[in-house]
Amino acid sequence: TWLRPGENRISFIEENGFHVVFGQRCCNKKGEDVCGDTFSFTNFGRKRAVMLLSDGMGTGKKANEDSRRLIETLEDLLEAGISEEFALEMIQDALLFQDKGAFSTIDAAVISLKTGILKLLKAGGMATFIRHKNSVERIMPAALPPGCRIGQQFDLKYKKLYDGDMVIMVSDGMLEFENMPEISFRMESLIGKIKTN
């Protein structure tokens, strides 16, 4: 519509209840030029923030190529308006069709900027930690990586986040040791010492 002289148009936009700050740290395995993990952080409009993490099978360049291709494909599907669940199912079917025998894990954390609800989708990834004000919550995966159609395709969990909470996603380089429960417990203890607002 056209405005007549002297008229003004005012638009009201609801402010989001939550804002997300991203941070990352990665390093290569000793002797490798590149890290086999790929990650991305994206705000999709004013509605949700999405964190993606993929760990390619093996190490180095090949693992990096596999995980990067998977993350880029998932980003393209989400940008096209496809839901996270359906996007993972499509990737699952595509990997099964290729049948190359190489599997990359997927961790997807989707945060509603309106409600603070965290939707966590995990396919073969490691534990995800939520640092609350007075506690640390550990979320363990059960589903296998995409391409392994045995049982569940991916885990789906919902969690409520509050002001100052932190969502910490890690790959097997942090937790894959002989004594997994002890390492995971130490990780929880370390995260618990992080100060939140």
Predicted regions span which residues?
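Acidic loop->beta-strand submotif enriched in PP2C/PPM serine/threonine phosphatases
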Residues: 32-46, 106, 139-182
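Active-site-proximal, acidic helix/loop segment immediately C-terminal to a metal-coordinating Asp/Glu
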Residues: 58-80, 161, 165-197
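Flexible glycine-/small-residue-rich
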Residues: 14, 122, 170-171
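Structural beta-strand/beta-sheet cores of well-ordered domains, especially the beta-sheet scaffolds
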Residues: 8, 18-20, 37-39, 47-49, ...
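Catalytic core of PPM/PP2C metal-dependent serine/threonine phosphatase domains
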Residues: 1-8, 64-133
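N-terminal entry segment of metal-dependent catalytic domains or homologous docking segments
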Residues: 4-56, 62, 69
